[in-house]
Amino acid sequence: MARAFLFVLDSFGIGNAPDAGAFGDLGADTLGHIAEFCAAGAADRAGLREGPLNLPNMSALGLMHAARLATGRLPAGMALPERVYGVYGAASEVSRGKDTPSGHWEIAGTPVTFDWGYFPADGDAFPPELVEAICREGDVPGILGNCHASGTDIIARLGEEHMRTGKPICYTSSDSVFQIAAHEQTFGLERLQDLCAVVRRLVDEYNIGRVIARPFVGSDPGSFTRTGNRRDYSVLPPAPTVLDRLKEAGRTVHAIGKIADIFAHQGVTRLTKANGNMALFDASLAAIDEAEDGALIFTNFVDFDMLYGHRRDVAGYAAALEAFDARLPDLDRRLKPGDMVILTADHGCDPTWRGTDHTRERVPVLMFGPTLRSRSVGIVGSFAHIGETVASHLGIDPGPHGRSLI
């Protein structure tokens, strides 16, 4: 029996989606712009990286071909490999948001066909009645922020006041999200998580996709640092996903990183938390070593998005891609006949783009394994085809959206 390993490189877009203009993202290209900066020497950073973007292993799996499918051109400073070893394509999203739940749920075979609720960018972000309910039911003396903001910026700006007053820092973005930052020592991690659970219930009527706990440590703006204890409080997917179908079939669904949170723990039989891309890769390799026939291992590599995309750090994003690429031979050596790996993404987050939000982009679909023969699957019309490919490979019934690519 087969095994499937689904790796989401969070925010690794490869060119604007056909409907990017409706999102204000026409021209966004996470991979292309990173490569352009690297080729121009604008992403050199002493002690970190230098030169053109170097992704030999993903290129050999078809990344350059997928990027050319998405944009009609090769990324700057990069060339086609002599040979491609994987099945490759570029996928467009049909869900109506460019957020994490929409992307992941669609990858798992369940597109989001409704509109999320969003908080306004002008004036106070949150309705007064919601703030009052949070203070009353969450037992806090008030909130700070109440605006659209970058998480690191707002912690630097309001962190000391938060520590002094005990008021949590509450903010949002262009995504359907309510984020709460609080100090792990002065406010308490458990208290923050309890508050997020309260807010999750309160924002249901606003149709908000996620509440996110953003704990941090430090004593002043120069030392404030977000910790690895982030937690996402998502609503349930609107319909069963491939995770549910696998679980119902008695299969192992091993969620690594924030995958379990994204799916509100539905359809997950085992979970592993890890902090940082390399720790997530190590956890994935350990899971592969133990995975039985018929299992799905599903990992989200969050650093690309959280540390580099939103922070518009081109050099950091490039270095993270190169570090991930260098680990792929470790994965390849562990594969057995019947194994299939899929590398993809949930949306874009172009680190050269205006603002700090996600970008509406096509994503790569790179599939490989001992029994897969190299070919192109072209432009894929929905991320849902990825989930149906997993379902077909693992021998379970298909879902209502998408089709297998193999």
Curated annotation (Swiss-Prot):
- Superkingdom of source: Bacteria
Coiled-coil features, chain-numbered ranges: none
Q: What is its EC number?
A: 5.4.2.7
Listed Gene3D superfamilies: Alkaline Phosphatase, subunit A, Phosphopentomutase
Query: What is a biological process (GO) this protein takes part in?
Result: 5-phosphoribose 1-diphosphate biosynthetic process
Which positions does UniProt annotate for Mn(2+) 1 binding? D10, D346, H347
The reaction(s) this protein catalyses: 2-deoxy-alpha-D-ribose 1-phosphate = 2-deoxy-D-ribose 5-phosphate; alpha-D-ribose 1-phosphate = D-ribose 5-phosphate
InterPro entries noted in UniProt: Alkaline_phosphatase_core_sf (IPR017850), DeoB (IPR010045), Metalloenzyme (IPR006124), Phosphopentomutase_DeoB_cap_sf (IPR024052)
Cellular component GO terms held in the UniProt record: cytosol
Q: Which cofactor does it need?
A: Mn(2+)
- Cell compartments where the protein resides: Cytoplasm
Which Pfam families does the record match to this protein?
Answer: Metalloenzyme
Entry's Gene Ontology molecular function annotations: magnesium ion binding; manganese ion binding; phosphopentomutase activity
Keywords from the UniProt entry: Cytoplasm, Isomerase, Manganese, Metal-binding
**Pathway the protein contributes to:** Carbohydrate degradation; 2-deoxy-D-ribose 1-phosphate degradation; D-glyceraldehyde 3-phosphate and acetaldehyde from 2-deoxy-alpha-D-ribose 1-phosphate: step 1/2
Q: Where does Mn(2+) 2 bind?
A: D305, H310, H358
Q: What is its main location?
A: cytoplasm
How and how many cofactors are bound, per the record note?
Binds 2 manganese ions.
Biological function: Isomerase that catalyzes the conversion of deoxy-ribose 1-phosphate (dRib-1-P) and ribose 1-phosphate (Rib-1-P) to deoxy-ribose 5-phosphate (dRib-5-P) and ribose 5-phosphate (Rib-5-P), respectively.
Provide the family line.
Belongs to the phosphopentomutase family.
According to UniProt, the name of this protein is Phosphopentomutase
UniProt lists the gene as: deoB
